[in-house]
Regions:
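Generic leucine side-chain signal with a strong bias for well-ordered alpha-helical environments
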Residues: 8, 187, 213, 221-222
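Minor-groove-contacting beta-hairpin "wing" of winged helix-turn-helix DNA-binding domains
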Residues: 228-232
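A short, conserved structural fragment
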Residues: 217-227
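Short amphipathic alpha-helical interaction segments
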Residues: 203-217
Length: 247
């Protein structure tokens, strides 16, 4: 297969560096065009959470997670994979279009099935009662410019719903919401914050963004190119924390 993608999880209970390196060696045998790697998250209320609380499993600390991530990125460099997002790596020209669509925060997408998410921009229309109804709100002046819908995760409820009446949760997003989401995703990518998109922001958001960038540039966490502000490789693992500077 010339278009294989593999998902990996590190930070498993009691996983040491040797075991993680052995898993990466096994991946190398398949030579996938793309791979994603995520640190294991203990979700509250899950079986794993109960087992960890009962000390049946011992979860690694942040220092171990950082070390395992370092092993991963070093391995990817040796194997010729581009780390184009904190958790995603690809051979040249093989970035995941599926993942990239989510991170763009502009492109609409449709989610089908239990737990699936959809996103689309609201049409720019005259703010009337009819427009409010079309946008799914009684208040056309709430500032929302986009909708995100999440189908409920209950499989039985989803399949038993009448046709066209699937149950979902809905989030209305303002320009500020979309700006914050863009910052959070862009700082995680190799492409960084696009200068053209910053220039197109509403004036208040553009001014705030440029002001918030400066300390990160001064401290060497971001660097500037002709077209973007990008997270340094060393700081990209901390991208979620860096995004807090923009809130």
């Amino acid at each position: 297969c010339d278009n294989l993608s593999i998902d990996l999880i590190y930070g498993l209970p009691d996983m040491d560096a040797a075991e993680w390196e052995a898993q990466l060696a096994e991946v190398a045998a398949y030579r996938p065009s793309h791979l994603s790697a995520y640190a294991l998250t203990v979700e509250p209320g899950s079986l794993l959470a109960r087992q960890v609380a009962a000390r049946q499993w011992r979860m690694p600390g942040q220092d171990v997670l950082a070390a395992q991530y370092g092993i991963l990125t070093d391995w990817c460099d040796r194997q010729g994979y581009e780390g184009y997002e904190v958790s995603n790596f690809a051979l040249p020209g093989r970035r995941a279009r599926h993942n990239s669509r989510y991170w763009d925060i502009r492109t609409p997408y449709l989610g089908l099935g239990p737990g699936a998410h959809s996103f689309y921009r609201l049409p720019t229309v005259k703010k009337t009662a009819d427009a409010a109804e079309a946008a799914g709100t009684e208040n056309p002046d709430d500032g929302a410019v986009a909708l995100r819908r999440a189908n409920l995760p209950d499989i039985r409820a989803y399949v038993s719903a009448p046709h066209g009446d699937s149950r979902y949760e809905q989030e209305r997003l303002t320009e500020t919401d979309l700006y914050h989401e863009y910052v959070m995703t862009a700082l995680r990518t190799a492409d960084g914050l696009d200068k053209g998109r910053i220039a197109a922001l509403p004036p208040d958001l553009r001014t705030a963004c440029l002001q918030n960038l400066q300390p990160l540039l001064t401290n060497g966490l971001l660097y500037e190119t002709e077209t973007a502000y990008r997270t340094t490789v060393a700081a990209r693992y901390r991208a979620d924390g860096l995004a807090l500077a923009f809130f």
